[in-house]
Regions:
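Mature catalytic domains of secreted/periplasmic carbohydrate-active enzymes
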Residues: 1-180
Length: 180
């Protein structure tokens, strides 16, 4: 009696229990710092499973002695997670009272295509700084080829950002938004 998840109708308790078990396995095996749910879990009917997963993840992290976060799109987790905005244009324009993150591709597509139009390193740095000043962050999506290699033009953008962070990183890391 659950709404569609990833286009499959309806979701049975057996399917959702299997999903929960697989998520717990990933948590146990890899102890991730960040668990990111892209889409497909936004339905309120899935809240019992999501709440158990969040409880398990945060309690596990406590025992590991590390801080972790869940990140999700839309309102999948109304509280206790970092809200994700897909693409820079959807990011908050003012300082938000909650942490958030934009996932934005290095180019005009999330995957690799021939002739991918890339953002400039300066534009990406500007977005990163703007996001941080508004209580947000930037998750930059790169677009490797099918063999896993990162094209040279994308590598150069990443190196340029890396050089900038090496010089100005102190002004970025540990920075928090502040209203005057």
């Amino acid at each position: 009696d659950h709404e569609a998840v990833e286009g499959r109708h309806p979701q049975s308790n057996a399917f959702l229990s299997e999903w929960e078990m697989r998520v717990r396995e990933i948590i146990d095996r890899y102890q991730p710092d960040l668990f990111f749910f892209d889409n497909g879990i936004n339905y309120r009917s899935l809240d019992p499973w999501k709440q158990r997963i969040a409880q398990y993840y945060y309690n596990s992290a406590y025992h590991w002695g590390k801080e972790v976060s869940i990140q999700s799109k839309s309102e999948a987790y109304p509280v206790g997670s970092i809200k994700d905005y897909e693409r820079q244009g959807r990011a908050p324009k003012e300082i938000a009272d909650h942490y958030w993150q934009v996932d934005d591709p290095i180019g005009n597509k999330f995957g690799y295509i021939e002739g991918l139009k890339l953002q400039s390193a300066n534009g990406i740095i500007r977005n990163l700084v703007n996001n941080i000043s508004r209580n947000g962050n930037l998750c930059l999506n790169i677009s490797p080829k099918s063999d896993g290699t990162i094209p040279d033009d994308q590598q150069e953008i990443l190196r340029t950002i890396g050089r900038w962070l090496k010089t100005y990183g102190e002004a970025v890391y540990e920075t928090r938004a502040y209203k005057i």
